[in-house]
Amino acid sequence: MSAEAACSDDSFGPWAGATCRGGFDFTLLFEETILSILPSVLVIVVAPIPIIRLAREPPKVRASALDWFKKISSICFITLSAALVGLWARNSTITQTRASTPSAVLTFVLSLVYVLLSTIEHRLSLRPSSVLSFYLGLSVLFDIARTRTLFMLEDATHSAIPPVFASSLALRVVMLLLESTEKRSLLLAKYDNAAPESVGGPYNLGVFYWLSTLFFTGYRKILEIGDLYPLDDELRSTGLAKKMSDAWRKVPDKAAPNVLFATWLKTFSKAMFMPVVPRLFQIGFTYAQPFLITAAIELAATPQTQPYNNNGYGLIGAYILVYSGIAVSVGQYEWRNYRAATMMRGSIIPLVYEKSLILDSCSSATFHPTAALTLVSTDIETITSGLVQIHETWSNLVEIGLAIYLLERQLGAACVMSVGFAIVVMVGTVFLARPTGTHLAAWIQASQVRVIETSKALASIKWLKISGLTDVAFSVIQKLRKQELVVSEKFRYLLGLSLILSICTPILGPLLTFAVFAGIAAHGGSTLTIAKVFTAFSIIVLLNSPLAKIVQALPQISGSIASFQRIQDHLNAEERHDPRSTTTGTSPESNNGSQQTLSDKQATADGDTMISISGKFSWRSETPAPGTGITLVTGSDEGHLADTTPDANGDSRDAPVIDISPRLDIPRGALTLILGPVGCGKSTLLKALLGELSSFDGVIEAKYSGAVTYCDQNPWLPNETVRDIIRGRSATDTSDADSSEKADHDEDWYRVVVSACELQRDMQIWPRGDRTPVGSKGISMSGGQKQRLSIARAVYARRALVILDDVFSGLDANTEDVVFENLLGNSGILRKANMTVVLASSDVRRVPFADKIVLLNQHGQVQHTGTPGDLKQVAELGWADRDLDAQQEKPGKDELNHEHGEYSESAPEKLRRSQTNHGADNNAAVQEVLQAVESQADTARQMGDSAVYKFYVKSAGWLTITIFVIAICVYAFCDSFPSVWLKWWAEANEKNPNSDLGKWLGVYAVLGVGAVAACLIGTWQLFIITINRSGLYFHNLLVETVSRAPMMFHSTTDTGITVNRFSQDLQLIDMELPSAALGVVMALSFGIAQFILVCVSSRYMAALLPFLLAVLYAIQHFYLRTARQLRLLDIEYKAPLYTQLMETISGVVTIRAFRWETQSTEKAIRILDTSQKPSYLLFCVQRWITFAVNMVIMMLAVILIVLTTTLREAIGPGYVGIALSNILAFSATMQATITSWVTLEIALGAVARIRSFSMQVRSEDDEARDGLAKAGLDARLVQPTPETVGERWPSQGRIELDNVTASYPSSGRVLHNITMIIEPGQKVAICGRTGSGKSSLFLSLLGLIAQDSGSITIDSVDLATLPREYLRSQIVAVPQEAYILDGTVRLNADPYHNKETLGSTDPPDSRDEQIIDVLKRVGLWEKIATRGGLDMVIDDKFLSQGQAQLMVLARAMLRRDESRVLLLDEATSSLDEATTTLIDEIVSTWFKDWTVLAIAHKLDAILDYDRVAVLDAGRLVEYDQPRELLQRPTSIFKELYLLSTNQASLSSPDSN
């Protein structure tokens, strides 16, 4: 018989037979149909898709030699294909089949399609053709086999077909190289910034070669954000947000459960489908492994001769193909999964941000200033974790089905035990998934509450420190942290239970399966063989992996869906509906011309009325806190505590806050002054004019369109430079005018505005002028500077309507008068521009300048309207004790300035001292320190720090971690050793079938139970004990660091960065780190055990250990240099996004007034895109290391099969089974190790940040010690004891300042040689213009700014030697801004005596009586008593600004027996006359024997003080009795007093 006859080449095969071509070849028919016709048909069918898609695309590359080479090679391909068609058609000399000619014809047709597709994709696509690259790669691989076959045919030497076919193969190799060549250097200029994955070919993307530049850059240098690749267009948030927003808008029922999740899946179905194909390939390659193990064991049992050696060579090729396929498919599957997750982040966060801009700010049920922060941080991270697990559900079910089928083939009915266990685990997991998701949502909610309270405290840290409330406020936060961990325990219990369920199957499943099989075999006459044992064991390993993944995936998916629902609830929250209507019946917001110019508005407006309002508004009733009877609302308006108090007839929560009847008209081009007592609803009325009161019951008719300028009572200042704040979003204005002319005009206007708002002097002092950042919430600015910046922004915007909410109250008298005159005087720029101004105030001094007066009474009703001359009765009001007639008789400001021109112009200039270079030098020094710290941090960022691991272990406790590690090692041993036990059992069965079953099964059972018990102990130690300990440890460390940090830290560090530590960093430590640590320790333990078994099975493999360790070390070293940096960049660049969100929400009323919603959203999206770059690239490099490690495993598997092929007689099938089954398990273990390790690295980044933060941020006391050492004194601070400071310090209140000089590190010296003595019981007022150093002197007494020289003593105790927090706890200070704790009235009134028992509801009755008495004295008790009394839970939204100030004063009053020094920082600046008088009376009587220092702007109230200190430019220029100073003709205090009281002349103090 001839070889051709023995080959059966015309049959499908695929094997050609043992006697055909050495027994190692395919049949010709198989090769021509499967290896030729099938790929050709697929390409011909698929090719039209990219051709149609690219048809309308513009050209993207310029002409090049590459294009010509492709065309030449395509023509050669057509020629050779045509030649092969002719040769096969006329062939009579070589063996052929019925598919030979069709195969050649299809190849020729394909060559024609190839030319068209290659040309189009080269010109119109950024990347190489995926279709052609895949085809050419497969074609080359397949045609190598076909070429071998053709040359091995007996009659091949007489035919031209083999050489022509070989030439075609060689040509396709060249074509593959040409088609795979990337075109970045050929791209047109506008595509130069295309992302690497946008221009990468399939092979580049498949092996992640496109990341190599990033890796080398990160290895060589410290990565900066500019070094990272640009985002792929598909990942840019602008397009993603629009796509998702459009889809969400079309959803009919937005309240349906989980409809947001369903909508997102539908909208981004393509992105979610992309991982499906690589996942299917991964399943195929994975489940090829049991067949390879079976073939290898069978090969090991054969002699080392031909043809068995050929089988071994084929097996080597199969192992290369399968394990390489696993590496590529796993990498591509995970990469595409995380691309989808990145798209989710880019599409959902803008939705949350945009919704936050339109929420109803007057409803707490729908709005909280920082609630959205948790949604875009914790919830988004939770969604990401769950989203990447979605494909694990269906794919693992497929894997489980395949494993069960394969297991049944090996063990028959005995597989029921594994199947049964799988069903039990799946049912249990599904049963646990919902409560797990629910408890995770509860944990996130508890975390949100804590983060909100933390953000609030950090935003007011200055006022907390001044008040000595730092410990109290942060102890509330620490209590919330403990509650959060208690809430999280339920979730952690369920997570641990799910884990135990998942490990029971791989441990107990095989035990019961083999036990049942052994029982059946004993009665059926069969037995366990080595091949059957290890094939079944490998299948069970494969069965366990998807089971474990499902158990892990379902809770994560459930948590992801719960977080989607939380975001959905936010998106469904009640929106603000503008109740205003224009004269055409539409809302002012309907006009898109938010940048309409002033002249345009005036030209289109009609009549003399700008806006009209009539109706009522009541704060809507929300669900009150139990027993409080009080409504939670949001807004900075006054009066809604006072005005919603139940009256005698019952609950009046729906009583109107404002009642405007009859109609109130705001005249156009005039100044309308709204007057009224504290808490009367002035701010609420302004909110109504802005359209902020959605539930306003009445009519608001706006006879204008477009934006309004608005200054809130509490200025909204984002953390930007002074210049950017003043210019606002005006840079985005569009105009037909020449841009350079417009820029010049804007610059001229900018200078005018700066001058009008008296900011030029401040800019000269600030180290960077108008480029100086203001800090979070303007923390680095004084109160007056913040107000003037807010006013300047409003003026700069040049809108027709200007609404000002008590904006002059924070300014000193001189500055207030000058700014008011510059803006609203007879020649003021707002007057000249004929702007309509509405000013709310409690100060009647501005009455003479108003065109219209609106007088509100205490119940929010319009008591009177008219001109200043009509309001004689205002003098009869209890809240305005000034004589209005006298006010109206005062000269205008022009006259005042003229008469006192010597002071307003010359006197201040004489007093101004040129600032030294101290500030600049200090600033440079700070920069050097910061650069040094940054350099140190950068080194750690790149190289890593093993101390971080020790730091985390320390937080949990060494004993806890030791028990955990030992337990996991025991678990690994008990779970790995059964493979050896099974080998011994199978070998024993070959000698004595089915004997000693009790021994074999008994030991197996002991190992299984031991594994479960050890895992249970380890899980408990980690998930319960470790999280509780480390969670409290790291939070307390952050609290301690932040609360003790100096003010300089808070003024220069963005609040969002610090909040990020309390939110994302702690979330990573709580949620990610323990699971990742468990995965890493488990995987390492199992990996070591499995590799030991592999080495025991094949001693030659042990020789690879040094090589393996070296390769793995090199990979991780190369990877970590970049990954660590990306991890930290990811965390760092998420902080600005959180800051932007917090700033936007806190200033949403201002943003909506100015119509800056679009600009704010665009800015947020830019920040989001920046944060996406390190986040996405971190995901990518993690996929790279997964791919790299899988390739290492491929090499190990190939080496092992090579050893099996060449040394199989020495190894034996038993050890081959152990080695290969453990290589299979080792592969899964290494994948798990990498997955857990990269997560652990991210989480440990949070630990490293906290560690670095706690080490680098020095405490106030540390800086105090440095100051003492610098002065040559003992650097130890005094420990406050009766022996060191006295029994009750300060007991007298004598204050002495001796040559005190102080400075801020960032802005230079602020106090110069201040010397003054204040005797016990004296009352001293500190006055001066804004920025003169009043607040700096105040802060120096509290140890909040650095003292360069001199000393401050109180009762002979040097303040520099005292711990800073102790100092502030002993001095009673009332700050300029009040801080209201979220808690009961009792806690707020008397927080200092609740430190040890926060939350206690049963304090002594006597103390309650004292609290009530004090609240009565300040006028708050009547409003509180009917709402729950001292047990009423309040927050900062329940009190108007004035009422909150009274609450702070009540705190001070309750400390009457604890100190003798009272500091008042402009405590009455925002109060009406009656309330100011009340506070003055309390200070003079309640604190009669105290030493009082008061910063004052209202100078008529301090004439009875003992002394007045006048500061200017940080120098003490006058210090004497106020009435004595008023007698001096050249007294600066006299000039300030005249301006403060609007008096043109002053004959004697007694006349006032």
From Swiss-Prot:
CDD domains reported for this sequence: ABC_6TM_ABCC_D1 (cd18579), ABC_6TM_ABCC_D2 (cd18580)
Annotated ABC transmembrane type-1 domain residues: 280-559, 963-1241
Region (Disordered): 573-655, 887-917
PROSITE patterns: ABC_TM1F, ABC_TRANSPORTER_1, ABC_TRANSPORTER_2
Gene Ontology cellular component terms for the protein in this record: plasma membrane
Compartments (UniProt record): Cell membrane
Domain spans labelled ABC transporter: 639-884, 1295-1538
SMART domains cross-referenced by the UniProt entry: AAA (SM00382)
Membrane topology: Multi-pass membrane protein
Primary site of residence: membrane
Positions that bind ATP: 676-683, 1328-1335
Induction summary: Expression is positively regulated by the leucinostatins biosynthesis cluster-specific transcription regulator lcsF.
Transmembrane segments: 32-52, 68-88, 100-120, 158-178, 280-300, 311-331, 413-433, 457-477, 500-520, 528-548, 957-977, 1005-1025, 1076-1096, 1100-1120, 1184-1204, 1210-1230
Keywords: ATP-binding, Cell membrane, Glycoprotein, Membrane, Nucleotide-binding, Repeat, Transmembrane, Transmembrane helix, Transport
Biased composition (Polar residues): 581-602
Pfam families: ABC_membrane, ABC_tran, TMD0_ABC
Family: Belongs to the ABC transporter superfamily. ABCC family. Conjugate transporter (TC 3.A.1.208) subfamily.
Summary of the function given for this chain in its UniProt record: ABC multidrug transporter; part of the gene cluster that mediates the biosynthesis of the lipopeptide antibiotics leucinostatins that show extensive biological activities, including antimalarial, antiviral, antibacterial, antifungal, and antitumor activities, as well as phytotoxic. May be involved in the efflux of leucinostatins.
Name listed for the protein in its UniProt record: ABC multidrug transporter lscH
Organism: Purpureocillium lilacinum (Paecilomyces lilacinus)
